[in-house]
């Protein structure tokens, strides 16, 4: 099981105090280590900080998180824990609609589903999950769980 943590505020610029907030994110990772000892990562932007520890199950090499994709100059970032039972179907549906994948991970399927379908994409997910998506364009942090 992976671990996810973070913080968000549109009233604060976390990058102005990068060392402080980077340290906080790293402390979060340390606390989550037992939930995902295989890999870990952080993401820090003006409005948002995310931390992730990973227990590698699928796409062991390319499923690193936080996973970042760019659209029209804006970043979309996901930290994810879970298992989708309909990964293959969603992936094929997105490929047919022109989406391109860099990995075979559930994480990327979830993020690209969000980018393609918008916030209602979660209704398409069949599985067990908890995740956060940072939407830089709309300056939002979206939290989801099954």
Report the location of each language-model feature.
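N-terminus-centric sequence/structural signature that marks the extreme N-terminus
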Residues: 1-146
């Amino acid at each position: 099981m992976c671990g996810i943590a973070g913080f968000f505020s549109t009233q604060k610029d976390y990058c102005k105090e990068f060392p402080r907030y980077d340290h906080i994110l790293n402390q979060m990772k340390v606390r989550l280590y037992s939930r995902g000892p295989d890999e870990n990562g952080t993401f820090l932007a003006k409005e948002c900080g995310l931390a992730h520890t990973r227990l590698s199950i699928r796409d062991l090499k390319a499923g690193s998180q936080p996973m970042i994709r760019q659209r029209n100059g804006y970043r979309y970032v996901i930290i994810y824990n879970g298992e989708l039972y309909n990964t293959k179907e969603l992936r094929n549906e997105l490929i047919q609609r022109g989406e391109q994948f860099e990995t075979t991970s559930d994480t990327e399927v979830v993020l690209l589903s969000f980018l393609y379908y918008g916030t209602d994409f979660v209704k398409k997910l069949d599985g067990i999950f908890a995740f956060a998506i940072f939407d830089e364009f709309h300056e939002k942090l979206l939290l989801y769980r099954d």
